[in-house]
């Protein structure tokens, strides 16, 4: 069975690669028809700008600055969400606290808090971390709490019947059963945080010290280097695809798919 698994992976990547090539061809044709590189650079011009930025070290430096802030804020947001979820699972008052806070803050766009963050923490890393923690914490807390709440009572009883209790019951039964919902919350939190970070650097000019990817796009727009703007956008998309494909899909494949808790899509990598 294992020997057959490279086939679906190869075919899936082939289909996606062909789709990307088709989109790039349409982009190139539209840019040539528009014939205005200031408004719409071609795919080839963007590729050259992207390659030049990578080879010069300019783009990797901006990417590293953005990811450093994102990883720090993401870790803090995950920790805060787990604390809130633990309180909600442990007592009625904790549940009321989680429900009240998520009802208040989950619908609130993180970027709307940035003006306050700039007043409180100034123009720098702390303001970005504050709004990114807000982006991560509430969707993850909601999904984690829903995941733990949906664990069937029969599954808990089965764990107790084989001698599991306390921490062993939590780690061997509860967390694996709630993991699909928790992974969904982690992915939603990542997506919210990533786009909030780029928007904050782009719209408000907020930087993490040496500037991030959004700042690179902002500066390129000011200097009318539209090809570099598109190169920065391509970097944003590429990082999103890499995190989704290499991190989250790998975790899903090694956990919930292997355990039979999530159905594998036809043609997806096994």
Predicted regions and their residues:
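Transmembrane-helix boundary motif in ABC transporter permease subunits
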Residues: 72-102
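Generic hydrophobic transmembrane alpha-helix motif, especially the helices
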Residues: 103-139, 146-147
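Periplasmic/extracellular loop-to-transmembrane helix junction in inner-membrane transport proteins
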Residues: 3-10, 32-76, 215
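N-terminal signal-anchor transmembrane alpha helix
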Residues: 7-34
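Glycine-rich helix-loop "coupling/hinge" segments at transmembrane-helix boundaries
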Residues: 119, 197-226, 230, 235, ...
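Transmembrane alpha-helices
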Residues: 130, 134, 166-200, 231, ...
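Short helix-to-coil transition segments within interhelical loops
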Residues: 148-154, 158-178
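C-terminal transmembrane helix and the adjacent membrane-cytosol boundary/short C-terminal tail
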Residues: 92, 149, 226, 230-270
């Amino acid at each position: 069975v294992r020997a057959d698994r490279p086939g679906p992976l190869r075919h899936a990547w082939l289909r996606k690669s062909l789709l990307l090539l088709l989109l790039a061809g349409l982009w190139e044709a539209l840019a040539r028809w528009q014939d205005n590189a200031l408004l719409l650079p071609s795919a080839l011009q963007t590729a050259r700008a992207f390659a030049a930025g990578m080879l010069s070290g300019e783009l990797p430096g901006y990417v590293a600055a953005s990811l450093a802030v994102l990883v720090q804020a993401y870790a803090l947001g995950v920790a805060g969400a787990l604390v809130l979820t633990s309180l909600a699972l442990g007592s009625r008052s904790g549940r009321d606290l989680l429900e009240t806070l998520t009802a208040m803050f989950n619908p609130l766009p993180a970027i709307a808090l940035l003006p306050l963050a700039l007043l409180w923490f100034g123009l720098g890393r702390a303001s970005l971390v504050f709004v990114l923690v807000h982006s991560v914490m509430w969707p993850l807390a909601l999904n984690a709490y829903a995941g733990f709440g949906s664990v069937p009572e029969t599954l808990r009883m089965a764990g107790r019947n084989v001698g599991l209790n306390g921490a062993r019951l939590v780690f061997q039964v509860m967390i694996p059963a709630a993991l699909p919902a928790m992974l969904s919350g982690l992915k939603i939190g990542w997506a919210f945080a990533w786009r909030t970070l780029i928007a904050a650097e782009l719209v408000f000019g907020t930087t993490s010290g040496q500037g991030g990817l959004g700042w690179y796009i902002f500066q390129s727009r000011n200097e009318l280097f539209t090809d570099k703007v598109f190169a920065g956008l391509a970097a944003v998309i590429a990082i999103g695809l890499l995190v989704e494909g290499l991190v989250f899909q790998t975790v899903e494949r090694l956990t919930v798919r292997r355990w039979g808790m999530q159905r594998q899509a036809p043609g997806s990598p096994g």
